[in-house]
């Protein structure tokens, strides 16, 4: 059975921006986890596309979208029923850099019962799901240093 993780925009941006400080780390991580099934949200894809387009250029954005089309990441649509939980999380973590895309990642993980996230945001270690369980950041700096 393949393991799943919800991916945030940071690793996706790093994957397609060779000048990103985390590019090599993300490429190495994904290369060493070929069975990892990535899923994400439209909010994350929007954020990733916008950053790639402005920071790297249109070709990087196009390459990213083609990768998504080929199954690099499965996009899970969230409807308006997810909004109250996203709003509640944004309010709860108002003192942290927790935005709409981050909330969409946390809510997707919660609703799909996925405990693993792939993010460069260290704050994800503090977030808790509705049952009080932490999300496990499998790309955390602690794991990278312990290798």
Question: Model regions: which residues?
Answer:
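Amphipathic alpha-helical segments within well-ordered protein domains
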Residues: 13, 46-49, 87
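Short, hinge-like loop/turn segments at secondary-structure boundaries
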Residues: 55-59, 94, 133-137
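Short, well-structured N-terminal submotif of metal-dependent ribonuclease cores
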Residues: 1-40, 53-65, 143-146
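General small-molecule cofactor/ligand-binding pocket signal
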Residues: 39, 76, 138
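Alpha-helix/helix-capping structural signal
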Residues: 10-11, 43, 81, 122-123
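Acidic, PIN/NYN-like endoribonuclease modules and their adjacent C-terminal/linker elements
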Residues: 2-4, 111-147
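Short secondary-structure transition/capping segments
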Residues: 51, 88, 128-132
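Active-site neighborhoods of divalent-metal-dependent phosphate/nucleic-acid chemistry enzymes
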Residues: 75-117, 122
């Amino acid at each position: 059975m393949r393991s799943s993780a919800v991916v945030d925009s940071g690793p996706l941006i790093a994957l397609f921006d060779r000048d990103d400080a985390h590019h090599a780390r993300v490429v190495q991580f994904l290369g060493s986890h070929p069975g990892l099934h990535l899923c994400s949200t439209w909010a994350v894809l929007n954020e990733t596309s916008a950053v790639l387009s402005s920071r790297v250029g249109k070709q990087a954005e196009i390459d990213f979208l083609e990768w998504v089309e080929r199954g690099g990441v499965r996009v899970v649509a969230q409807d308006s029923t997810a909004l109250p939980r996203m709003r509640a999380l944004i309010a709860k973590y108002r003192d942290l850099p927790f935005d709409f895309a981050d909330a969409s990642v946390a809510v997707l993980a919660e609703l799909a019962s996925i405990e693993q996230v792939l993010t460069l945001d260290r704050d994800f270690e503090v977030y808790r799901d509705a049952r009080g369980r932490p999300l496990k950041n499998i790309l955390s700096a602690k794991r990278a240093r312990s290798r």
